[in-house]
């Protein structure tokens, strides 16, 4: 988990994943496998990506009763993912159970996968929070509460907007991971996400990792776009033509 860039492999099949990754042959990436791909291909897709030398964020956002989450995480620990997640809204006991499952399922001699919590989806805005989810607190307070709860439950970090990263770090400590989706270049469309930022702004605001999907996976030249991502993250200090 060295590179700060997490590439969202939002594809329906292994064949499309292979096609996208072909230009990056020999370059280890940090990739995200979400529901769409995992539910089609199963654990084999994680094994395939690990064989290719990539780190894997298995983004399934578990949210169920504690024992179910514990048993599920026990299984996911054996799959080989480097990072997994749950919904913080599942509560303290569920998040503690997730860690228990990961500890129990991680093979001897291997580090357990890091586990982070989703605070609020980046498609959630204040109106949706209050009118549809019936949460009366402001969005920023809700995110802060969920982040603190995740920290107290033994998790390694949270998924959050870059705009929330700084105060989460203040509340939970610098080592508590802030993983930020909703990353777009300045000239991209926001699509179905509301709280979006550029790579450069995400770094300035304190994000440890940024998740980039359509801006990269649907680019005409993914390799060049990845280089642009590096360039923006580095504040324009240098630009690489080959991913590192």
UniProtKB/Swiss-Prot annotation:
Q: At which positions is substrate bound? A: 10, 32, 59-68, 122, 184, 193, 213-214
Q: Where in the sequence is the active site?
A: 61 (proton donor)
Q: What GO terms fall under cellular component here? A: cytosol
Alphabetically sorted, this entry's keywords are: Decarboxylase, Lyase, Pyrimidine biosynthesis
Residues making up the signal peptide according to the UniProt record: none
SMART domains given in the database record: OMPdecase
In this record, what's one Pfam family? Answer: OMPdecase
Tell me which Gene Ontology terms the entry assigns under biological process.
'de novo' pyrimidine nucleobase biosynthetic process; 'de novo' UMP biosynthetic process
Q: Which reaction does it catalyse?
A: orotidine 5'-phosphate + H(+) = UMP + CO2
Note the superkingdom of the native organism: Bacteria
Stated EC number for the protein is 4.1.1.23
* Key word Lyase present: yes
Q: Which pathway does this chain act in? A: Pyrimidine metabolism; UMP biosynthesis via de novo pathway; UMP from orotate: step 2/2
Q: Does the keyword Nucleus apply?
A: no
Q: Which Gene Ontology MF annotations are present?
A: orotidine-5'-phosphate decarboxylase activity
Q: How would you summarize the oligomeric state and partners of this protein?
A: Homodimer.
Q: What does this protein do?
A: Catalyzes the decarboxylation of orotidine 5'-monophosphate (OMP) to uridine 5'-monophosphate (UMP).
Name the family.
Belongs to the OMP decarboxylase family. Type 1 subfamily.
- This protein is called Orotidine 5'-phosphate decarboxylase
């Amino acid at each position: 988990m060295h590179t700060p860039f997490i590439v969202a492999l939002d594809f329906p099949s292994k064949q499309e994943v292979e096609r996208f990754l072909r230009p990056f042959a020999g370059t280890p990436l940090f990739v995200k496998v979400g529901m769409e791909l995992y539910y089609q291909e199963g654990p084999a897709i994680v094994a395939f990506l690990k064989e290719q030398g990539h780190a894997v964020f298995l983004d399934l956002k578990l949210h169920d009763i504690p024992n179910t989450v514990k048993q599920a995480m026990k299984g996911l620990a054996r799959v080989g993912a480097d990072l997994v997640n749950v919904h913080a809204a599942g509560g303290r006991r569920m998040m503690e159970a997730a860690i228990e499952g990961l500890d129990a399922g991680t093979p001897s001699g291997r580090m357990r996968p890091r586990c982070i919590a989703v605070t609020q989806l980046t498609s959630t805005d204040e109106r949706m929070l209050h009118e549809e989810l019936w949460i009366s607190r402001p969005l920023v307070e809700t995110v802060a509460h969920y982040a603190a709860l995740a920290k107290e439950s033994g998790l390694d970090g949270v998924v959050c907007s870059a705009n929330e990263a700084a105060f989460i770090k203040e509340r939970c400590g610098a080592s508590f991971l802030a993983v930020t989706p909703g990353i777009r270049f300045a000239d991209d469309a926001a699509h179905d996400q509301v709280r979006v930022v550029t790579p450069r702004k995400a770094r300035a605001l304190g994000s440890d990792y940024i998740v980039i999907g359509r801006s990269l996976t649907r680019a005409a030249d993914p390799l060049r776009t990845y280089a642009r991502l590096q360039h923006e993250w580095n504040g324009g200090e240098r630009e690489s033509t080959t991913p590192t």
